[in-house]
From Swiss-Prot:
<feature type="glycosylation site" description="N-linked (GlcNAc...) asparagine">
    <location>
        <position position="62"/>
    </location>
</feature>
<dbReference type="InterPro" id="IPR001841">
    <property type="entry name" value="Znf_RING"/>
</dbReference>
<dbReference type="GO" id="GO:0005789">
    <property type="term" value="C:endoplasmic reticulum membrane"/>
</dbReference>
<feature type="compositionally biased region" description="Basic residues">
    <location>
        <begin position="385"/>
        <end position="395"/>
    </location>
</feature>
<dbReference type="GO" id="GO:0072089">
    <property type="term" value="P:stem cell proliferation"/>
</dbReference>
<feature type="zinc finger region" description="RING-type; atypical">
    <location>
        <begin position="272"/>
        <end position="313"/>
    </location>
</feature>
<feature type="signal peptide">
    <location>
        <begin position="1"/>
        <end position="23"/>
    </location>
</feature>
<keyword id="KW-0833">Ubl conjugation pathway</keyword>
<dbReference type="GO" id="GO:0016567">
    <property type="term" value="P:protein ubiquitination"/>
</dbReference>
<feature type="region of interest" description="Disordered">
    <location>
        <begin position="363"/>
        <end position="406"/>
    </location>
</feature>
<dbReference type="GO" id="GO:0006511">
    <property type="term" value="P:ubiquitin-dependent protein catabolic process"/>
</dbReference>
<dbReference type="InterPro" id="IPR040700">
    <property type="entry name" value="ZNRF-3_ecto"/>
</dbReference>
<dbReference type="GO" id="GO:0005109">
    <property type="term" value="F:frizzled binding"/>
</dbReference>
<keyword id="KW-0863">Zinc-finger</keyword>
<protein>
    <recommendedName>
        <fullName>E3 ubiquitin-protein ligase RNF43</fullName>
        <ecNumber>2.3.2.27</ecNumber>
    </recommendedName>
</protein>
<feature type="transmembrane region" description="Helical">
    <location>
        <begin position="198"/>
        <end position="218"/>
    </location>
</feature>
<feature type="region of interest" description="Disordered">
    <location>
        <begin position="731"/>
        <end position="760"/>
    </location>
</feature>
Amino acid sequence: MSGGHQLQLAALWPWLLMATLQAGFGRTGLVLAAAVESERSAEQKAIIRVIPLKMDPTGKLNLTLEGVFAGVAEITPAEGKLMQSHPLYLCNASDDDNLEPGFISIVKLESPRRAPRPCLSLASKARMAGERGASAVLFDITEDRAAAEQLQQPLGLTWPVVLIWGNDAEKLMEFVYKNQKAHVRIELKEPPAWPDYDVWILMTVVGTIFVIILASVLRIRCRPRHSRPDPLQQRTAWAISQLATRRYQASCRQARGEWPDSGSSCSSAPVCAICLEEFSEGQELRVISCLHEFHRNCVDPWLHQHRTCPLCMFNITEGDSFSQSLGPSRSYQEPGRRLHLIRQHPGHAHYHLPAAYLLGPSRSAVARPPRPGPFLPSQEPGMGPRHHRFPRAAHPRAPGEQQRLAGAQHPYAQGWGLSHLQSTSQHPAACPVPLRRARPPDSSGSGESYCTERSGYLADGPASDSSSGPCHGSSSDSVVNCTDISLQGVHGSSSTFCSSLSSDFDPLVYCSPKGDPQRVDMQPSVTSRPRSLDSVVPTGETQVSSHVHYHRHRHHHYKKRFQWHGRKPGPETGVPQSRPPIPRTQPQPEPPSPDQQVTRSNSAAPSGRLSNPQCPRALPEPAPGPVDASSICPSTSSLFNLQKSSLSARHPQRKRRGGPSEPTPGSRPQDATVHPACQIFPHYTPSVAYPWSPEAHPLICGPPGLDKRLLPETPGPCYSNSQPVWLCLTPRQPLEPHPPGEGPSEWSSDTAEGRPCPYPHCQVLSAQPGSEEELEELCEQAV
């Protein structure tokens, strides 16, 4: 028998007991109650007190007997002197005896066998005794019990008739036989307040109620715990009922479209992570709050037992503690987004976000606060909020809007040289890919497929990615060599994570359009795949490095390309051997537009000097057109000399070989103050295109060697305070101490040997003092 049936019987057995008692004792109890009630009404007990006339101080001779009043006479108390009467004495009416009235007569009845024919009835004898002066009549019916029935018929006698038998009758007769005189008093016995049968009935009722209450308490206490409703289970069931469900439709998935960068996932349907079966048409799926989908029949038992997502351990009842601990790294998982787990690459989860997230206003800087980075030299305390790099949007912008965004987002990219413009125009055409979304800034991009070119740079780091070919999806982002501190310092990030060639968020990445390499004013196409700057393969002609490597690799040696012309540093030259410390917080000028740079370089190269080197002038805005980028390289040598000095100041941990190196003239504040030549402040209008990607702006910071006195502080007639400033200092003559009032005789942008240098960042002044080792050291540090 099961436990439930046993509990039901245990609860019902008190009621069954009461029904059995009523069935067994119902009729008998009713009859007994009726008989007792009739007896109570028919027989009234009497208390007979016998007090001897002889005084007994101890009181042992006093008798208290109990009898029953007969119905033949009235029930009244009486008292008198005790006197015995024979039964035959009451048969005749003689007047011989003159008895005093007020006595109590006791009559002992004999057995009916001894007197089969009595002379008078008992009722007649009781009348006769009363007529003779008895105040009460006592009948001893010990030998004739049937006499009680004869005395029940009422005759209306006024004196009481009491029946006595048993032990009480023997005690009274013994007192009589001793001829002792006594005074007898007959009293009515009061009925008890609670008769015996009433007490038993009450005890039965009370006991039954107590048993019922005890059984109920035991049933409640002994109830199995599994039958009790668990609050946690109820909450879990409610949470599961609130989860969304849907019918899987493969056609809808194809209609929504696979994104261009998820081509690896279009060959198979999503998979249930529990049963490892693909979703088929019409299957009912359960969508958990963490946006993971499973078969409803597979995940519901798991949720009832564990209350967490099988993949990300998201708790459906208490919230996502795990996702909250990740903080901003999971901020892009908004409600309503779907995540697809692609099983073609085991161990890599591919998250595809809808385009609404990438194109919506949630990409603003307010939604995700920028992470603090190292303090760059181009920023001063109190100059306003720092601008951080934003990821590219998926939709093309107008040329003016892109230029304004680039100028607003990258105010610290003011040390950008024209060599970058030249190298941008000389890049081979980038491999075009379809329009795609940009990822959030904190996503690693593992498993993404891009069209890249084979890298021409083979680093000696432990994780150099030199095997990425066309349309190769690299997943080795987490093992890229990130040990160089300079890589982190230049980019402005304190993170130790670097992207590989397959990541479009590589800090050294920019986009080159497909087309004529001579067009420097072309807008970067949003359909072009961003490629790493170290993936340039020289084809046919000398390629200019597309970016500046700041690392410790010792395999880039540009030996014997330049010769020093001048004297080595020493005390006889009068040139100071150490430069004053340069503050890292001085403001930097913004990069000019490419067309203005080309115009300035073309106009400055034939003349060799400026007409008014002491007055800054603003260049007019030229019309965009094809310009030979190779003509820009010679005019930017002084700018990269300034960059070299800033780079050597940026890496003080590297050892210097030989004696202390001579600082470049561009880094001396006193020389720059004496020769403030060629100060050009081009107009920066939105109509001029920006030839480089905004992502590469923070790579090269402005030269910290420029003195702040060269920069305009108040608006003047030649420039506006809101316009960027470009400075170039290119002395042709050796920089030697000049007499007072005498300055350099000539300024030019040519190199020492009269030929343009294919490495702009290694161009030096024509008469720069120093040795070949120092030149190699500077070139090596620049690389």
